[in-house]
Amino acid sequence: MSTPATPTSCDILVFGGTGDLALHKLLPALYRLHREDRLPADTRIFALARSALDNAAFLALAERNVRAVVARSEFAAEQWKGFAARLDYLAMDASQSADFGRLARHLKSSEGRVLVHYLATSPSLFAPIAQNLSIAGLAGPQARIVLEKPLGHSLDSARAINQSIGRVFDESRVFRIDHYLGKETVQNLMALRFANALFEPVWRAAHIDHVQISVNETLGVENRGGYYDHAGAMRDMVQNHLLQLLCLVAMEAPVRFDAEAVRNEKLKVLQALKPISGLDVQDKTVRGQYAAGRIGGQEVPAYYFEKNVDNDSDTETFVALQAEVENWRWAGVPFYLRTGKRMARKCSEIVIQFKPVPHSLIDGGGGPANRLWIRLQPEERISVQLMAKTPGKGMQLEPVELDLNLAEALSRNKRRWDAYERLLLDVIEGDSTLFMRRDEVEAAWGWVDPILAGWREHYQSPRPYPAGSNGPEQAQLLLELQGRRWLE
Amino acid sequence: MPDVRVLPCTLALFGALGDLALRKLFPALYQLDRENLLHRDTRVLALARDEGAPAEHLATLEQRLRLAVPAKEWDDVVWQRFRERLDYLSMDFLDPQAYVGLREAVDDELPLVAYFATPASVFGGICENLAAAGLAERTRVVLEKPIGHDLESSREVNEAVARFFPESRIYRIDHYLGKETVQNLIALRFANSLFETQWNQNHISHVEITVAEKVGIEGRWGYFDQAGQLRDMVQNHLLQLLCLIAMDPPSDLSADSIRDEKVKVLRALEPIPAEQLASRVVRGQYTAGFSDGKAVPGYLEEEHANRDSDAETFVALRVDIRNWRWSGVPFYLRTGKRMPQKLSQIVIHFKEPPHYIFAPEQRSLISNRLIIRLQPDEGISLQVMTKDQGLGKGMQLRTGPLQLSFSETYHAARIPDAYERLLLEVTQGNQYLFVRKDEVEFAWKWCDQLIAGWERLSEAPKPYPAGSWGPVASVALVARDGRSWYGDF
């Protein structure tokens, strides 16, 4: 792949332009990029949706949503006016090819302009949109397509989508989003691992006892019940975010920090994941579904009472599982993955638990082995837990933490940027390092599908857990049976 | 506070009215009493040459103690209890007849600890007289530095003491070993697999050990001008720190297991050949300059100065350890008086990653460091590379410290003074924080060859202005190897 460069002219077409993702995430991110002069000078933004709005009505809707999202100090009328001048709305039905002809005429000449087609729509529309873009002459060499999750529902459906997209766009022009990869601390993982000689010699089975990766939310499904009930936590979170984090922890050093080299290494990890199938699902996985409980002092309803959720749904809102990477570096090291909704705390975290020292000099044992904590949210931080001498007389040990609170360490002048700003900028510049490649997505589905099949075949229903807890008790057992426990 | 067994003894403090005793030992004993770490039967005998009424001397002692102990830690009830333990005895340490009185003052049932806060030249005489008076049985002796001024004189002192006391009852003090963070070095190294795995020449590029003092000679002319910074600081404190950093894991925490490993390091120190002295060692002597914004005199201009002295007040040197673990890893040692600040610090520089994948212009930034701050503000800091914040192209890196500051983490806990810990260990009979005879002698042997080399060179110490980090040559010493001192300037 050639070195990414910033184009001078760019058209961004947002399909699903009046949807939540567009209004709450994409437009605020684009506004911020505009405000900081990071967009190409000649950028046009087209919001496309079925709603019969005129341009003025759309601009009013956009302004209301951007104001609600960005900080008051970041919103200025003059800047909004400049941004609004870039914005255009076109009502169209993305499933109708005739509308794409109209779209092409609306764009006028796109010669020499980068085209970014952002599909903030249902995945069922991905294939028709790609096909129609091609027919309308909007899928030329300068065109890129951005796909939001979910990318299918299974390996077969993901493959079908990828094949349809692949017929129109070659892989270098497809940008599959996992917004987790745009987060600051996720990117810090790369720097931590490959810019520090200190960690690399211990980053292997000989020194690491196990790895824990948790992505816990206090929120329930809210308005996404209809989608979520069909997907479940495994498809919604594990197949993408958690496996991506696992890849970043477990991957080998790439030869260069560029898209293909990095994604090659991630793919190798996914290919090395030991399958969990058949009866293994009972030993290696735990499913949960939240029941009524209390969060933040508030009573919250059970999952099956949420809007748009089937009353006798057996969809999981919690998954814990033990993954294994069967390669030279990691054989024998369990990776415990955990994710859930309506958990006690919102927390995304990676914990590397090292093995104890080979011989303890201190009577009564040396205490806990070392840990490296990488907190993704809230409060991004990195922490090493060590043993140190208890202050005062005698030689007793106690754990202490060397930590770096990234939010504190960074200059107060610098604004905390959003994952979507990073990702949008990368699409415009053609840098796909932080996006998922086709084979990564398919390999991830290839690993997840047998687990889903195992659950169906063996009638593994989700265990109830009260909202505001740490998930089903069986999740504790998963680790306790091997002499370990979840940390926080 | 962890539970510590407290044992009774009689502490006979030789040199009780000397500066060390009044500034350090009595305050430490007071603090131990305050924390109930002196057994109720423990007694302290203050011994000095000065004649006169004991009550007078004890009053002087009380005055000095009130000055030395922070006001919030002073407690009259504790003082009264401490006062009850105290007796003063006037005696000439080299007069055998004087020990009759000491013999009568000592309780036969309690072990005796004889603390020599005196010049080493009288250690032998005191030991002989203790033995003659029947006071050597079961007695522990505590020896303050300096123990000699070279290998030969050190041996003489050690042999004079060894005639009457076995090594197991000799406690040679290096007060650095009593510091909290120095002890944490042992925990840090041997209770944490994260570091021990990499504690070798495969992963470590070089090590810096700095012990900098802000003050000048402070009236210690009689001793210091004969000794110089190498004998005053390197032979003991800096080499002890080097041993703790470089030693192999002991099999347990017993005194001799630890000290065996330290001796192995000292034996592996490569002598610096005469032809390499100029490139590997820098001597300095401070000249007039500024400290805390005030003009201060040079060494040769100090009150009572020996005007043609060539004693060094600064030493920087590169030490190599010839063993499997450390071959090829230089240890840069640096110590001096009239430095910009008081600082004792160890910096472990790890090697660069084997293959660099980020932006080429940032390559020079890449290295990890473990910084162990001994004083001031004891703490540990691990410097790692993280991603810089921002939307800039590629992966911009920055150094971020993962750190532990003892004063922050343990703000409620009072960290004891080094002498408190050392005195407690003596009363408990633990030797691991004390220096063994062969340690002292190997350290002198290594220093002696340096001193002999300097004398043959007849080279004067290089001047450096007070308030600077030493002679420019000390920067060149490290720069010659493509490195720089951490954090200077």
From Swiss-Prot, chain B:
Taxonomy, superkingdom: Bacteria
* Pathway noted in the entry: Carbohydrate degradation; pentose phosphate pathway; D-ribulose 5-phosphate from D-glucose 6-phosphate (oxidative stage): step 1/3
Residues annotated as binding substrate: 175, 179, 213, 232, 337, 342
Describe how expression is induced or repressed.
Transcription is maximal during early logarithmic phase when inducing substrates such as glycerol, glucose or gluconate are abundant. Transcription decreases during stationary phase.
Provide the alphabetized UniProt keywords: Carbohydrate metabolism, Glucose metabolism, NAD, NADP, Oxidoreductase
Residues forming the catalytic site: 237
Gene Ontology biological process terms from the UniProt entry: glucose metabolic process; pentose-phosphate shunt, oxidative branch
Protein name in UniProt: Glucose-6-phosphate 1-dehydrogenase
